[in-house]
């Protein structure tokens, strides 16, 4: 509405779009873009002015990362290049609609219960000593300075290379 547009810079009316639920897994580029376009259009109609897009669910990436493998939540196989960059596309689509795009990362979760195979360049494969297992998941040990520094590198990579309007660090999966 016109009123929503007037207050869009004073009110943060955001919606979270997650990948970890598998809604995109195995979709073609066109189908995923069609799904996301529909979601963005509906959220815009509802007055949302920001999208919080999950780009790192398990030390993987829904963007062309300098550090981590492509997410299995895109193609069904971790490390498989989907042939496009969902984060770059989402930034363009959100900005075209006058919406902000905030990148959402899960900093320490390294493997969900549903992931059976990790890519060869995954942190848990390269440095298993930096990860612990708990309840079927792998978690980067937050007590290790090297892991905290690694997450800072990942964040720096995102904010330097992408025109994100914000960054959300979200995790509540610790034992």
Language model features with spans:
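Active-site-adjacent "subsite" loops/lids of carbohydrate-active enzymes
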Residues: 10-34, 103, 107-162
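A mature extracytoplasmic/lumenal domain signature
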Residues: 19-21, 55-57, 67, 105-107, ...
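Aromatic- and glycine-enriched glycan-recognition loops and surfaces
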Residues: 27-46, 73-97, 149
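Aromatic-lined carbohydrate-binding/catalytic grooves of carbohydrate-active enzymes
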Residues: 46-82
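Boundary at the C-terminal end of the N-terminal hydrophobic targeting segment
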Residues: 2-4
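Short catalytic/ligand-binding loop motif for oxyanion handling, primarily in non-cytosolic enzymes
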Residues: 59-63, 109-114, 175
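Catalytic domains of carbohydrate-active enzymes, especially glycoside hydrolases
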Residues: 34-61, 161-165
């Amino acid at each position: 509405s016109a009123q929503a547009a007037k207050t869009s810079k004073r009110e943060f009316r955001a919606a979270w779009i997650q990948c970890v639920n598998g809604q995109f897994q195995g979709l073609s580029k066109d189908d995923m873009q069609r799904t996301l376009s529909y979601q963005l259009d509906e959220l815009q109609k509802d007055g949302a002015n920001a999208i919080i897009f999950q780009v790192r669910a398990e030390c993987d990436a829904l963007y062309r990362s300098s550090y981590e493998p492509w997410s299995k939540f895109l193609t069904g196989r971790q490390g498989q290049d989907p042939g496009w960059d969902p984060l770059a596309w989402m930034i363009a689509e959100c900005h075209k609609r006058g919406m902000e795009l905030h990148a959402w990362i899960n900093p320490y979760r390294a493997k969900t219960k549903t992931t059976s195979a990790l890519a060869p360049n995954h942190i848990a494969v390269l440095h298993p000593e930096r990860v612990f297992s708990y309840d079927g998941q792998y978690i980067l040990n937050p007590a290790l300075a090297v892991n905290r520094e690694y997450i800072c590198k990942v964040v720096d990579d995102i904010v330097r290379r992408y025109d994100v309007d914000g960054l959300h660090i979200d995790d509540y999966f610790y034992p």
